[in-house]
């Protein structure tokens, strides 16, 4: 059961990384004189809410991770990749079958990069939850401390770390963190919430 969960988890991660790259590469109308937002002193020019969310969250969370010494360790990355390979083998799959050594190396690099990103994000979420508490929602790549994110962002906004000048974009940005109807919450005090940040999801067992 654990191996099947690991395979599903990593498959979603690969798709998510592809979608993430697509968002980064998407162009949006800009107005050099009127940025939609500023983040850590940098102007953000976009009319797309998803691009805005990424442009704000990425530097703020990078800064948070640096402040708290959050990173993926080599042993954790290796364990993640090993779980993935075990899961693929259990399903009778082999990503390297029929590939050249160069292609195999590229796949290994992709796995390591994916593992590093997912592990780091899980650790950031764990740290935010430990600091702010609140409710947790179910997400494809693991538990997400939604209330902690909102408090973190409200604090950073009050400190002047970011500002959204466009009222319409601001409303759509904050909706993700304030509209409960669009999320699936773990029961506060329930089993899922209790174990959410005790065991990394790629090592979870039923």
Language model regions located:
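Short, low-structural-confidence N-terminal segments
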Residues: 1-53, 58, 147-206
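Residues in flexible loops and secondary-structure boundaries
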Residues: 9, 47, 68, 80, ...
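Extracellular/secretory pathway and lumenal proteins
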Residues: 14, 21, 69, 132-133
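N-terminal targeting/tethering segments
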Residues: 21-115, 206
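Contiguous hydrophobic segments
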Residues: 71-84, 88-99, 129-143, 185-206
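A contiguous, mid-protein "functional segment" used to position or interact
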Residues: 113, 117-174
């Amino acid at each position: 059961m654990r191996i099947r969960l690991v395979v599903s988890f990593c498959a979603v991660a690969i798709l998510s990384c592809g979608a993430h790259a697509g968002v980064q590469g998407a162009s949006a109308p800009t107005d050099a004189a009127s940025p939609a937002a500023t983040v850590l002193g940098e102007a953000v020019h976009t009319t797309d809410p998803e691009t805005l969310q990424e442009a704000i969250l990425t530097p703020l969370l990078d800064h948070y991770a640096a402040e708290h010494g959050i990173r993926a360790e080599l042993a954790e990355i290796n364990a993640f990749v090993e779980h993935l390979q075990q899961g693929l083998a259990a399903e009778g799959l082999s990503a390297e079958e029929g590939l050249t050594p160069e292609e195999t190396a590229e796949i290994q690099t992709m796995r390591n990069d994916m593992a590093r990103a997912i592990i780091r994000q899980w650790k950031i979420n764990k740290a935010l939850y430990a600091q702010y508490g609140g409710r947790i929602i179910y997400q494809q790549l693991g538990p997400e401390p939604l209330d902690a994110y909102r408090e973190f962002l409200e604090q950073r906004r009050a400190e002047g770390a970011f500002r959204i000048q466009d009222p319409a974009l601001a409303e759509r940005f904050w909706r993700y963190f304030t509209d409960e109807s669009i999320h699936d919450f773990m029961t506060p005090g329930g089993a899922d919430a209790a174990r959410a940040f005790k065991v990394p999801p790629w090592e979870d067992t039923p």
